[in-house]
Design a protein with these regions (language model features):
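Sec/Tat-exported extracytoplasmic proteins
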Residues: 74, 80-81, 99-106, 135-139, ...
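N-terminal targeting signals for export/organelle localization
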Residues: 2-58, 241-261
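Thiol/selenol-based redox catalytic cores and closely related redox-interacting motifs
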Residues: 138-226
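A short beta-strand-turn-helix
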Residues: 55-75
Length: 261
């Protein structure tokens, strides 16, 4: 369950389209891509504290790592849970589209996509591996879990809210085990961009517009009524894969376009 929090409330879709065209125009000219539009999110320039960057996390491969492990790469960090029925499958679909564009631009080794759970009690490494296999996550993706205390500390540091809530009625059915779900996690939908020096540079707080995104059938079936509405009728406050590429272009200094379908 995603909390109804938006980063672009009240913005005009036409203004957003115009701003994206400006970024694209800058990228195609002699200068490097400029900062993303304020309609998309917030430009920041804050070093991630070592007390957070060095916290131990566990990858889907069962290896211990930390956010500091990707210094030297641009990191796109998002919160998620594998049992989200409203927005996380849509976010994953958009990130897959973005990754294809990054790879097509020859930047796969310079950009790391990281999905860090807000449900550490259920999202074990083995479950994250199953999710990776299900969605076909590329090599430059990392799915992360950790102790509840570490997960809470990291997301509190970045200002991303989440909370355990009651499961809906009727409850959803786990796409992996076939069992009924017993609780849900309400959470903000955030995209955080860290530069190669490990500094937070841009943040987006909004739900995804996943029109045309590659969402696997199992996760489409897993969506609840709100999730299906989010997929078929995205509102004007949502972000698209094309829009979310602009911070990566800015931080890498390279033009990035979504490949033609």
């Amino acid at each position: 369950m995603a909390a109804m929090v938006r980063g672009w409330s009240g913005r005009l879709r036409g203004a957003l389209v115009a701003s994206v065209l400006v970024v694209t125009a800058c990228a195609s000219g002699p200068r490097a891509p400029g900062p993303p539009s304020a309609y998309l999110g917030t430009v920041v320039d804050t070093p991630v504290s070592a007390s957070v960057a060095d916290l131990p996390l566990i990858t889907d491969a069962g290896q211990v790592t930390s956010l500091a492990a990707w210094h030297g790469q641009v990191v796109v960090l998002t919160d998620f849970l594998t049992l989200c029925q409203e927005t996380c499958p849509l976010t994953t679909g958009n990130l897959l589209m973005m990754d294809r564009a990054v790879s097509a631009a020859g930047l796969a080794r310079r950009v790391r996509f990281v999905e860090l759970t807000v449900d550490p009690n259920r999202d074990t490494p083995s479950r994250l591996r199953a999710y990776r296999t299900l969605v076909g996550a590329p090599a430059n993706w990392t799915l992360l879990t950790g102790s509840p205390a570490v997960i809470a500390r990291i997301w509190r540091y970045f200002g991303v809210w989440y909370q355990q809530v009651a499961e809906g009625n009727p409850p959803g059915t786990d796409w992996l085990t076939g069992r009924s779900l017993t609780y849900d996690i309400a959470h903000q939908d955030a995209l955080l961009y860290l530069d190669a020096r490990g500094r937070e540079r841009f943040s987006v707080v909004a739900s995804p517009n996943a029109t045309g995104a590659p969402i696997v059938p199992a996760l489409r079936r897993f969506l609840n009524a709100q999730g299906r509405a989010n997929l078929s009728r995205p509102d004007a406050s949502t972000w698209t894969a094309a829009e979310a590429l602009s911070p990566i272009a800015w931080l890498t200094g390279e033009m990035i376009r979504l490949p033609a379908n």
